[in-house]
Regions:
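N-terminal beta1-alpha1 ligand-phosphate binding loop
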Residues: 1-31, 37-43
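Helix N-cap motif at beta-to-alpha junctions
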Residues: 63-66
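Flexible, gly/pro- and Lys/Arg-enriched active-site loops
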Residues: 30, 35, 39, 45-54, ...
Length: 163
């Protein structure tokens, strides 16, 4: 059994429902959430101006799938929930990122683990710290040693319901 850490985000439609639906659909894909952070509301980072705020959460999942299969499952769930990829860092109904997968380091065009920008984003780091108070990446980086700007991030809802 493998552990994949996923970041979830949504800023269009019923944002909270989209996050919960993603958890439920991922379980049907064999990527079952075993822990969830609280849901955080965060200001958009990058992308077009005047985007609505995001809801974000981090989930720990267990799966028999490999990292590429987990990414494929995330992409299928995004498509099922209406995700379109028209504008880089634009608004979206759902975004699911593979942040970590066991202690694996992957550096390929279609998949990079650890996620290359996860340590720069409060909407990833703050929820991740709820699940692991002192996470250490496969390359030895301690997240607590990094300066992350928490401005614009605020708790919004309790953890997502696990399947």
């Amino acid at each position: 059994m493998h552990v994949a850490t996923l970041g979830l985000g949504a800023n269009l439609g019923d944002r909270l429902r989209s996050l919960q639906s993603a958890v439920d659909l991922l379980a049907a894909e064999g990527v079952r959430a075993v822990a969830s952070s609280r849901v955080w509301e965060t200001d958009p980072v990058g992308g077009p101006p005047d985007q609505p705020p995001y809801l974000n959460a981090v989930i720990l999942t267990e799966t028999h799938a490999g990292p590429h299969e987990v990414l494929a499952a995330c992409n299928r769930v995004e498509a099922e929930l209406g995700r379109t990829r028209e504008i880089r860092w634009g608004s979206r109904t759902i975004d699911i990122d593979v942040l970590l997968y066991d202690e694996l380091i992957v550096n390929e065009p279609e998949l990079t683990i650890p996620h290359p920008r996860m340590t720069e984003r409060s909407f990833v780091v703050l929820p991740l710290l709820e699940l692991d108070p002192d996470p250490i990446l496969a390359d030895g980086t301690r997240i607590l040693d990094l300066a992350v700007d928490a401005e614009g991030a605020r708790p919004y809802a309790p953890p997502l319901v696990l399947p």
